[in-house]
Amino acid sequence: MKSNADLQKDVQEAIKWEPLLSVAEIGVTAKDGVITLTGTVDSYWKKTEAEEAAKNVAGVKAVVEKIEIKFANNSFKKDDNDIAREVLTAYQWNVEVPRDKVKVKVEKGWVTLEGELEWNFQKEAAKDAVRDLLGVVGVTNNIKIKADTQDEIERKDIETALERNWSLSDREINVKVSGTKVTLTGKVDSWYQKTEAGRIAWKAPGVWSVENDLVVDYAYELAD
């Protein structure tokens, strides 16, 4: 059981624990399990790291991210064409991103990714390769998953994989399969568990989409 103040402190400590993040840069407020992050950082990577750190704190049901990016000096500001070239170069060195499968658009530092890939881990790798680049202020990942395999998705295999995971073994997660789509419903204790369940479902052969409708239902106590 956590109060708003306790949850706020835990999130602040989680952010502080990240070596390149500073609590002084990021403001944290907590209300009924919803965390709001504000402040200014000098890279997109820091922005996403702060959000991930907050999501993984026990008791967090949702994160509202309002962090702004302001580069420390003009040397970090890059032309959109330069950013696009750096993204494509990053993909050439990344074995998880199939060559010439991802289309890149850059507008005022905001990168949009499009195309079709076979696996979700490839889609995530494409996004992760971009977030570390200087000059990037945001990423929209519109890559679609279209697996080549024609295997029928086995609901039981996904359920077994979820039960094998130490953080999910005692959770009641319902799995529904409709064609190439998997839907997860039920309740979990943390944002981490919700994300982990979705990641596991994506690994099933033949999956084109995962609708993660799991509800984070943490026992929450308001402060007096």
Report each predicted region and the residues it spans.
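N-terminal targeting leaders
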Residues: M1-D224
